[in-house]
Amino acid sequence: MVVRLTSTRDSRMGEDKVSIQSSAYPLAFRVDPSELKLEPLPLVDGITRVRSYARTLEGMQKEAVIQYGPTAAIWRVVSDEGPWLNGTDLAPFPLAFFTAGMAASLISDFVDEAGDRGVQIDSLEFTQDNFFTMQGSALKGTMAASVQPMQVKISARGKDAAEDYLRVAESAVHERSAANRCLREDLASRFAVRANDHDLAWPGLAADAVSALTDPASVFDNIRPMSGGDTTLIRKTDTVAEATGDAVGLVADQKRVVHVNNQGSIRKDGLISLDVGCIHPPGSCFRMLSDGEDVVGSQERAPSGLVYLSAGIAFCFMTQIGRYAQITKQSLNGYRIIQDTAFRLSQNHDPQAFAVETLVCLDTDEPDDRSIQIVRMAEQTCYIHAAYRTATRTEVTLA
């Protein structure tokens, strides 16, 4: 019998009773779209849109439904946190989704670029390291996330010379990759905020693409896996020991670095295998499978890199909402978001990433100004929103 992820109370106010461990569903699966009736996301002007509907579950757990516009594929994934945030460590942490999604996209871009150049790939190993920092005081409002340049190391074997593979790698990352553009450009995020079904005045850039959408609470009541999805898309491969003392992520004053590592390769069946884990602070490792980005040609047996990447943004931002509210002891009974990410995929070396647009729906007893402050601080302390608004250049080397 399949246990559905639903609550015995109102779906907006009872999210604390829903958990990953109470469900028989896998950590990731493709969703049967017949009962969801989501608004289509057509491909306009060559722009690929990815829409994420996300909600909180028990503790630090979260659930997201990700809609990939060009093919209308819908995926459901869940996220958790490790001991650094008193999580239950049952699913990948948010930065794992972002890191794995970036890696999957870059691997696909490398393979496509090699094909265009006639460079043969007999084997491929891909190493990626992402570094994020958190510094400041949550109580004083000075806490902020920042990002360091991503490091990519590629080991490719074939009949061609090493310099050919290096040229392919540099071109794939710096000239072909739409995913990497979200790190390369300075993209300020846009928001709309709704508290208890009441629209609030957001002082920053407006999220016009999502501001008029309906609270996504009911989306999660009609999720069913598509038949035939027997492949385990996400699983834990290594478990970190339980932390001792206070959870470092819940300390009011912080100065720390987060290091996430990914090891990627291509399986014989063509799926991309991604082993991602948190190096500092020490965390568990998860294996995530991904299929190609191509609108034409991909079998969509697993989420694409852009799906995982978009899920990571949503999960990380939601973690910061809950973390800030917990540290500052603000009343927050539940929260959900609808997030749009957009990319222009291109074979002509002119890709593009667009600013993230997010509708935030809060269930709270706090006044309007504090609700706005929760969202403002969540953006300020979100590692991935920091990556979007900070232009960095990815470092590429050949092993």
How would you describe each model-predicted region?
Residues 102-106, 316-317:
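Alpha-helical metal-binding/catalytic segments enriched in His/Glu/Asp
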Residues 5-99, 111-311, 319-399:
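Extended beta-strand/beta-hairpin segments
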